Amino acid sequence: MNQCELSKSVKISLDQYFKDLDGQPPHAIYDMVIACVEKPLIEYTLQYTSGNQSKSAEILGLNRNTLRKKMQLYNIE
């Protein structure tokens, strides 16, 4: 999947999310989307690197301490 396909998937999901609101006002969707994407991204990257946080942080383009904070936030061990 390339970046354009990922973007299309996000747009389709958001379109469905707004339809499902059924007139209710949306709230904090940025945080919702980031949380829905960030946790599995971190989990997958850690799995890909066999749990190596330094390699995962490098792949993600994050500082290792930032990765650790995000792991704590999402309860990832």
Please place each PLM-identified region on the residue numbering:
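Bacterial C-terminal helix-turn-helix
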Residues: 1-5, 12-13, 19, 24-77
